[in-house]
Amino acid sequence: MDGIVLDGAALGSTAIGFFLFAAFVGGFASGLAGFAMGFVVSGIWLHFLTPLQTTTLVVGYGLLTQGYGVWKLRQTLAWRSIAPFIIGGAVGVPIGTLLLTYIDPAYLRSGVGLLLVIYGSYGLAQPKLKPVPGSVGADTGIGLANGVLAGLTGLPGFIITIWCQLRGWPKDAQRAVFQPVMLAAIVMNVIALSIAGAMTAATMQLYLLGLPAMVAGLWVGFKLYGKLDDAAFRKVILVLLLIAGLGLIAPRGW
């Protein structure tokens, strides 16, 4: 177990244990809510992995978790409704990547975190809001904003997740929209990371090591998801958004 070497240092059995634990919990969060896997695992992995290694693993596992989620919900997918978000995201991701040269992502993450904390806290304290009407133009704009944020911070799901919740859709309808949109953004990131040479042999070894734990957590999360009604799912989303917001605001000590 100590044979995995990253940047010249071997991971000990304790670090590998935490790595596998985070993979399971991250898979569980993705199976239960359809997002938040990256925040769950990053909070642990960044203690012994570099940001690039963590990002590469999160994107790789995201391809699995979101792909599996889309496949599980394939009967409810409405591509005509999804298309405006993906088109907007395809434009937004490169814009966000370009803006990285001019904007400090750390400040942006803190700002996004504050908004998530406010939204999550308000949603948990208040009754369900009246559904917001949508349109193709609005959906494309949300996709654009979601793509810009994904390009800037690597966070492909928050704006689209909140929008789907504000629309007042049932839980399956929400996931049938925001998971394909997130999957499309992740595919773009996989291509970019592959071109950048981030997919090293050691990182792939770690990916394969954590794969069974991630799959197990994903399966358990989906099983529990099937037992949630729309009201309970809404609370799960709000709690995860609140936790994610706090995680973005909290100082990083690694």
Tell me what each language-model feature is.
Residues 78-89, 110-113, 133-143, 173-180, ...:
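Cytoplasmic-side transmembrane-helix entry/capping segments in multi-pass membrane proteins
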Residues 38, 50, 104, 108, ...:
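A helix-boundary/kink motif common to multi-pass secondary transporters
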Residues 16, 59, 112-116, 120, ...:
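Residues within membrane-spanning alpha-helices of integral membrane proteins
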Residues 1-14, 254:
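Short, strongly hydrophobic alpha-helical membrane anchors
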Residues 53-125:
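Membrane helix-loop-helix hairpins that form the core translocation module of multi-pass transporters
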Residues 4, 14-83, 143, 147, ...:
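Small-residue-rich hydrophobic segments that form or flank transmembrane alpha-helices
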Residues 66-74, 111-135, 222-223, 228, ...:
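Transmembrane helix exit motif
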Residues 54, 95-100, 109, 149-155, ...:
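Hydrophobic alpha-helical transmembrane segments in multi-pass integral membrane proteins
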